[in-house]
């Protein structure tokens, strides 16, 4: 990491279909090897499947899923006198969003459906109903933080 200055944050433009910045960030995380059009078709295809299955606006389901996956607290390692403690700390809002997006996509990639579009739509539907691997990941992180609550006074 550079000590001189932090890299300036780049502006993320809203996606063309919904005009939402979070959808663009999600799309960029789905993207492999700079293939944005492929990522776009996967995400929009998943949204179309969600709309067909639930008869609800897909953006609402997506936002609900992301809310259910974003962690509020996590543990970070802190070395104190030869021992390493897992110290629970609150998660900043930007990191919450990034972790939520990352966990949703990782969980979707690990599913058994045939295409990525189907996997993503199924994981988003599960997450919006508080089920699925992404929600389980959030619960595991919260459990770790709760188990190490005794070390919260080592917070920095």
From Swiss-Prot:
Q: Which Pfam families match?
A: Ribosomal_S7
- Record has Ribosomal protein as a keyword: yes
Gene Ontology BP terms: translation
Q: Listed GO cellular component terms?
A: small ribosomal subunit
Transmembrane portions of the chain: none
Name the gene behind this protein: rpsG
Question: Which superkingdom heads the taxonomic lineage of this protein's source?
Answer: Bacteria
Q: Which SUPFAM superfamilies match?
A: Ribosomal protein S7
Q: Which proteins does it associate with, and in what oligomeric form? A: Part of the 30S ribosomal subunit. Contacts proteins S9 and S11.
Query: What HAMAP family would the database entry show?
Result: Ribosomal_uS7_B
Known role? One of the primary rRNA binding proteins, it binds directly to 16S rRNA where it nucleates assembly of the head domain of the 30S subunit. Is located at the subunit interface close to the decoding center, probably blocks exit of the E-site tRNA.
Which keywords annotate this record? Ribonucleoprotein, Ribosomal protein, RNA-binding, rRNA-binding, tRNA-binding
Q: Does the keyword Ribosomal protein apply?
A: yes
Query: Which family would the database say this protein is a member of?
Result: Belongs to the universal ribosomal protein uS7 family.
Supply the InterPro entries for this chain.
Ribosomal_uS7, Ribosomal_uS7_bac/org-type, Ribosomal_uS7_CS, Ribosomal_uS7_dom, Ribosomal_uS7_dom_sf
GO terms for molecular function, please?
rRNA binding; structural constituent of ribosome; tRNA binding
Signal peptide range equals none
Write down what this protein is called.
Answer: Small ribosomal subunit protein uS7
